[in-house]
Design a protein with these regions (language model features):
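An N-terminal hydrophobic leader/cap segment in hydrolases
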Residues: 1-23, 28-36
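Active-site glycine-rich loops that stabilize anionic/oxyanionic intermediates
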Residues: 41, 47-52
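Conserved alpha/beta-hydrolase
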Residues: 54, 61-87
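Residue in the alpha/beta-hydrolase core beta-strand immediately N-terminal to the catalytic nucleophile
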Residues: 120-121, 144-146
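Active-site nucleophile loop of the alpha/beta-hydrolase fold
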Residues: 146-152
Length: 152
């Protein structure tokens, strides 16, 4: 797992964040950012919506940290700085919606290896909510979840 960029100048979030490149089971490079601290009450996973990116959730992660939780956010394949599947890098294409589950699996594997504090919770917005619901149905070890609109 190599370091990935995290643009703190637009993040407006906690300053101690880190970003990593993760590789999914089908070899797609995705970006994840996290704020993990040892005396945390648990971890809140943040699943963004379509056309969103990690830095948009900086304020959210700052609030999460202020209430005593670690957080981890993902750029889905074809979104943010994650790898694009087509030549035109401005298009956020995915072959099958279920492919996003590979992104979830890579994120969970990373969080498990890094020993992110449990229990785990999920905040999922729009498309991230649809991805999150499927992941929960597939066994994502989440204790509680918040889904927000519009796609939800």
């Amino acid at each position: 797992m190599k370091n990935a960029p995290l643009y703190e100048d637009i993040l407006e979030g906690p300053l101690d964040g880190q970003a990593r490149w993760l590789i999914t089971a089908d070899n797609v490079k995705i970006r994840a950012a996290y704020w993990n601290f040892s005396n945390s009450n648990g971890t809140i996973f943040v699943f963004p919506g379509r056309n969103e990116y990690i830095e948009k959730y900086g304020r959210t992660c700052k609030k999460i940290q202020s209430i005593g939780y670690s957080s981890i956010v993902i750029d889905w394949r074809g979104q943010g700085l994650s790898e694009r599947l087509v030549k035109n890098k401005l298009i956020g294409h995915v072959n099958l919606f279920q492919d996003y589950q590979r992104d979830v699996n890579a994120l969970v594997l990373f969080a498990t290896k890094k020993r992110f504090p449990e229990p785990w919770f999920l905040f999922a917005h729009s498309m991230g909510g649809a991805i999150g619901l499927r992941a929960i149905n597939n066994g994502l070890p989440i204790q509680k979840v918040i889904f927000s609109a519009p796609m939800w």
